């Protein structure tokens, strides 16, 4: 969890002991070592540029960029993605970059604007859209992932996650 907001760390702190073990680390702790059987997810702050972005990219095989349906987020995403495209590993296609619409309300004008923008991003994959709903609040409070929560209440969320899981090849 490299984001000062600490959302990932907070989620891990809420995780029940009887669930699969997930190790966490913050930028203030010794970094986790990645083995061939390990997936390491870095939660980084928004609007990272320059040498900090370069440092994060060197550790990545894939980058998922969530974008919320708001004029400010869309503008920030355009700037970030233009910067990201100029980075060597992205130019050489050594890193896959995927886009996710986050907290989407499908039938709103701003979501349609975001959806159109993400579809048109050249060289980047628009993977899926996650709807805005309370299951993510429940997930944050319980330390559970969507696929660990009740199937009947998360069925639509699971469908929205499947394209991302497939893209990540998890």
Which functions belong to the PLM regions below?
Residues 51-71:
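Inter-motif core of Ras-like GTPase G domains
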Residues 105, 115-147:
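Beta-strand-loop-alpha "switch" segments that mediate conformational coupling across diverse proteins
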Residues 4-6, 71, 104-107, 135:
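Conserved nucleotide-binding/hydrolysis micro-motifs of P-loop NTPases
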Residues 75-103:
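Conserved C-terminal guanine-recognition region of P-loop GTPase G domains, centered on the G4
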Residues 8, 41-43, 65-68, 99-102:
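Conserved beta-strand segments of the P-loop GTPase G domain that flank and frequently precede/overlap
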Residues 145-170:
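NTP-binding/hydrolysis catalytic cores, primarily Walker-type P-loop NTPases
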Residues 1-58, 140-144:
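P-loop/Walker-type NTP enzyme "switch/lid" segment
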């Amino acid at each position: 969890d490299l984001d000062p907001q600490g959302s990932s760390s907070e989620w891990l702190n809420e995780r029940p002991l009887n669930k699969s073990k997930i190790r966490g680390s913050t930028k203030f702790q010794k970094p986790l070592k990645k083995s061939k059987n390990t997936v390491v997810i870095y939660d980084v702050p928004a609007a990272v540029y320059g040498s900090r972005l370069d440092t994060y990219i060197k550790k990545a095989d894939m980058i998922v960029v969530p974008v919320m349906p708001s004029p400010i987020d869309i503008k920030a995403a355009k700037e970030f993605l233009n910067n990201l495209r100029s980075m060597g590993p992205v130019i050489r296609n050594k890193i896959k970059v995927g886009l996710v619409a986050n907290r989407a309300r499908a039938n709103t004008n701003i979501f349609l604007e975001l959806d159109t923008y993400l579809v048109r991003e050249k060289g980047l994959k628009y993977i899926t859209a996650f709807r805005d709903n309370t299951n993510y609040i429940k997930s944050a409070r319980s330390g559970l992932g969507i696929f660990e929560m009740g199937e009947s209440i998360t069925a639509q969320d699971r469908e929205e996650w499947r394209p991302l899981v497939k893209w990540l090849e998890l």
